[in-house]
Amino acid sequence: MEHGEISSKAPLVAPVAAGVNRAVAVVDTFLRFIAIIGTIGSAIAMGTTNETLPFFTQFIQFEAKYSDLPSFTFFVAANAVVCTYLVLSIPLSIVHILRPRARYSRLFLVFFDTAMLALLTAGASAAAAIVYLAHKGNVRANWFSICQQFDSFCERISGSLIGSFAAMVLLVVLITLSAFALARRH
């Protein structure tokens, strides 16, 4: 090749990069739908959790419900906020399929995905601490395990953590994918 000649391979770089970014955008959109399912499932499972136990007579009853514990209320709110954000971010993710070179919208998603990851981590961690106390108690603090009496309640609150922690992993993957797509531009 002579000085000043244009290589025939040069134009192929842009379509390949756009194709990779388009594939990343498709995966991004799919993972957002899965994360929506995880967060809404966790919020619904925790938000509808309650159990009532009769004690000696029908007039005295013990009740366990998620709203009795602020950590569980925060967990439901955090999952609802993250789920709403994920639903609202779907159109932007679809834009990335149509326009794989979009840069500022990817930066927007990286920023807000990171903020939502922090919120979801805080909510899930707070709830996980209370779930642990419900199962194990704390002898030193005189907090007894309630799961022998409220087994259905404990199963539901434990199960609700699964979707939330799965959504946390998916958000980490989404942030990584967006960073990868941004890095491919340079």
Swiss-Prot record:
Gene Ontology CC annotations of this record: plasma membrane
Pfam families cross-referenced by the UniProt entry: CASP_dom
Transmembrane helix is among the record's keywords: yes
InterPro entries given in the database record: CASP/CASPL, CASP_dom, CASPL
Subcellular location field: Cell membrane
Transmembrane segments: 24-44, 74-94, 107-127, 161-181
Ranges in the topological domain labelled Cytoplasmic: 1-23, 95-106, 182-186
Bilayer topology annotation: Multi-pass membrane protein
Function: Regulates membrane-cell wall junctions and localized cell wall deposition. Required for establishment of the Casparian strip membrane domain (CSD) and the subsequent formation of Casparian strips, a cell wall modification of the root endodermis that determines an apoplastic barrier between the intraorganismal apoplasm and the extraorganismal apoplasm and prevents lateral diffusion.
Family, as annotated: Belongs to the Casparian strip membrane proteins (CASP) family.
Identification of the protein by name: Casparian strip membrane protein 6
Organism: Oryza sativa subsp. indica (Rice)
